[in-house]
Regions:
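N-terminal export leaders
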Residues: 1-12, 118
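Compositionally biased regions
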Residues: 5-6, 20, 27
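Bacterial N-terminal signal peptides
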Residues: 11-24
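Active-site-proximal cofactor/substrate-binding loop regions of enzyme domains
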Residues: 29-114
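Short, conserved sequence motifs used for protein processing/export or organelle targeting and
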Residues: 89-219
Length: 219
């Protein structure tokens, strides 16, 4: 897939060893690669967005620019499907993305399901346009990672990809339930929107989640 990559999403702990076989991804996506996490926490920024929402293109552009400026932060765009009934069907949307948004909000004691909405790690939704976002990311980046992750990916016959993961908890720095997710995202996507609030616009997207696997509950 053009510009595709894997990233870890969600709260992480261990021990865990898991393997996945994914169909339909191009051979170029992962001929053979390995990755291991470092000691510093890599903040996760989740943008919940939709092509049918006229306030979302600005947030999409912000995420694309931020991902280029700050590659040590994990940026993910989850396109939600609850806008699909309002004039335009988002081809990148999935019901699982809206369900994840709802779960994340409930775990943070919040209820407002809106787009665009940005959640950073275990913090409550934050205004992506404000100074609080930069401060939160800076503070998060100085923290020590609570888990060690190792991942390898290799191309398989028939256009399939094998992904192997191992996770190990380092100490007791994770409070509450620990879940492991795996997300495949794609960059450089474009859509000519023909209906709905963004009719007539060419929308450009990066870090779009195309496959979400998990969660694995870690005891």
């Amino acid at each position: 897939m053009r510009g595709s990559s894997w990233t870890r999403a969600g709260a992480l702990a261990a021990p865990l060893a898991a393997s996945l076989l994914l169909a339909g991804w191009s051979h170029a996506a992962a001929a053979a690669c390995q990755s291991r996490s470092g000691k510093a926490l890599r903040p996760l920024v989740e943008l919940y967005t939709a092509e049918g929402c006229n306030q979302c293109p600005a947030a999409d552009a912000w995420l694309s620019a931020s991902a280029r400026r700050q590659p040590r932060i994990s940026w993910l765009a989850f396109h939600v499907d609850y806008w699909d009934a309002v004039g335009w069907v988002d081809r990148y949307a999935a019901a699982a993305h809206g369900q994840r948004q709802q779960y994340r909000l409930q775990s943070l004691g919040r209820q407002a399901l809106v787009t665009p909405q940005v959640i950073v790690g275990r913090d409550a939704p934050v205004d992506w346009r404000g100074a609080a976002m930069a401060q939160l990311l800076a503070e998060s980046s100085r923290q020590v990672a609570p888990a060690t992750l190792a991942m390898s990916a290799s191309a398989q016959a028939g256009g399939r990809m094998r992904v192997d993961m191992q996770a190990r908890l380092d100490g007791d720095r994770i409070a509450g339930p620990a879940l492991l997710w795996l997300a495949l995202y794609e960059d450089g996507l474009e859509t000519a929107v023909a209906a709905g609030e963004n009719a007539g616009r060419m929308l450009r997207h990066d870090r779009v989640v195309r496959k979400l696997a998990g969660p694995w509950k870690l005891e």
